[in-house]
Amino acid sequence: MKFEDLKIDQRIEKGLRENGFVSMKEVQQKVIPMALEGHDIIGSSQTGTGKTLAFLVPTLQRLVSLGWGGGDGLGCLVITPTRELALQIFDVLSRIAKYTVLSTGLIMGGLEAEDELLKVNQMNILVCTPGRLLQHLQENPYLSTANVQILILDEADKMIEMGFKEVLEDILEYIPQKKQTLLFSATPKASTARILKLEDPRIISIYKEEGFPSQLRQYFYMMRTGDKINYLHTFIGSNPEVKGIVFFSTCKEVKFHCLLFERLKLRNRIFCLSGGMSQKQRIDVFKRFVKEKNGILFCTDLGSRGLDFPKVDVVIQYDCPCNVETYVHRVGRTARNSERGESYVYLVHGEEKLLTDIQKKGWIKKQEGMEDKGISEEITEGPGVQIRCINNMVKRLVRSSKELNEYCRKYLVTYEKFLTFSSKRYSEGVIRKIPALYEHFGVSRDQSH
């Protein structure tokens, strides 16, 4: 089914066509017709399935059909958990709404609230993060929500996980009861919909627990804690043309490894993205990595939910994820839109339980014809490679650089705290190896505490 088959305004259709959106994906085919009829929607769909257009297209059509314009004020609120996801949604919205008269705006933490003060009430559609939106609702006399027709909550489950439940409840106090609500989550959890108290929502789920994309190859490596840096250096150094994402546990760990790999002077361009960066820095990195054909992004789980980085060849999980769901979200950054992708997870003794847990979830399942294509959904041990040991080189770099030494200590301290407070199912064995990790980097544990 194509977008042109929908009874939508020609200006919206033109914006879609101009940006290469011609055929509808499954979630769009199921959601858009019901949303156009005015139904409330509770949808669950994995990231990368096209749910952004599933809520933006009916929103634009609703407001255009009402003759909405500048004098009508705010007609739609789109609330999403992270600044990067808000930026991504706003980019798509701006492009497909190009030929309509609707004004669009973006408000999010990390930018000056004063700069947004007078602009927000001039917008017909606002994309926002929950904390900044509530701040405007409470403090900005220019923002009126009296005419809001549509409320969209994207990645609603993630907002709850991030502690925004009370913030969302406060926001709802400012929104008219008579409105259309579109709620989307990456996973089908009823708890995320309860706060909205919808009377007769349409439930749409295309969440497929039975398997990963058939074009995804998944590998694991069992190793000693101190060998992780050797494996990562070997992979990056041997693959200068790939576009990849490496997931770490903490912001300080991301920063340290970015500084370290800059000094190792490989041919790959290294990008760094974490919650510890300023908003301007995060936006700049996000935009640059999206445009790059190759390069390696070092990030925390900030980059594992919702963000759509095109043509990512490989995902490396440097640290074992806290649970199977996090593993799934991370590997979901590659093998998107029917393209091939590879995933590697580095495990130390005690963390192999992750593989068992994935098996128990039933998400490891071979599909018909996969063997013929040389692709397997099984998570298998990674192919044998000649690993270059750089431990001594890393020690010398850490000792000779005050900045690197400082961030190495911060990384190790925060990593130990992270393991202490995270799920003990995978981390107990790793915590005992922390002293050895200090030795591998040549820093004193006593001075770090």
From Swiss-Prot:
Motif (DEAD box): 154-157
Function comment: ATP-dependent RNA helicase required for ribosome biogenesis. Involved in the release of U14 snoRNA in pre-ribosomal complexes. Required for pre-rRNA cleavage at site A2.
Source organism (scientific name): Encephalitozoon cuniculi (strain GB-M1)
Residues holding ATP: 45-52
Major subcellular location class: nucleus
TM ranges: none
This protein's name: ATP-dependent RNA helicase DBP4
Locations listed in the record: Nucleus, Nucleolus
Family annotation (SUPFAM superfamilies): P-loop containing nucleoside triphosphate hydrolases
